[in-house]
Amino acid sequence: MSLMTRRAVLAAAAIIPAAALAQTPAPSDAYLYIIWPNDGQVIKGAFWCRFGLRNMGIARAGDKTPNAGHHHLFVNVNEPIKPGDVIPADKNHIHYGAGQSEARVELPPGRHTLQLVLGDADHKVFNPVVASKKITVTVY
């Protein structure tokens, strides 16, 4: 392999990880919040969770419009949220990729924490992280 070819291969190898770790920027004044339920709310059965967002827009998953993303509801999640992380899709990380601003949520009886996290077109956490305050609800 010639010196030029080796340099080209090394340069390409250096670029690929950087692209894979790219983080989508968010405005520093973006504000995500849960409109309802309120922190400490006691709820009977399923409920409508309403999402609020300021200084950014809502877009469907896959839509790369700048300063826009879609909601994810974290249920009973305690792991830290880091910019660039891919948001898992499971019962604790509920994706709203159609651009929903409210959703009917069904949880088993008991205490639960809820937190909204805004994801980019590829379900990655923005930089800086755009997340609501974590709230606690009790379902009976």
Named regions from a protein language model:
Residues 120-127:
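Short acidic/polar inter-strand loop motif in beta-rich domains
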Residues 45, 69, 108-110:
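A glycine-anchored, Pro-Gly-centered beta-turn/N-cap motif
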Residues 1-13:
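N-terminal secretory signal peptides and thylakoid transit peptides that target proteins
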Residues 128-140:
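Short beta-strand elements
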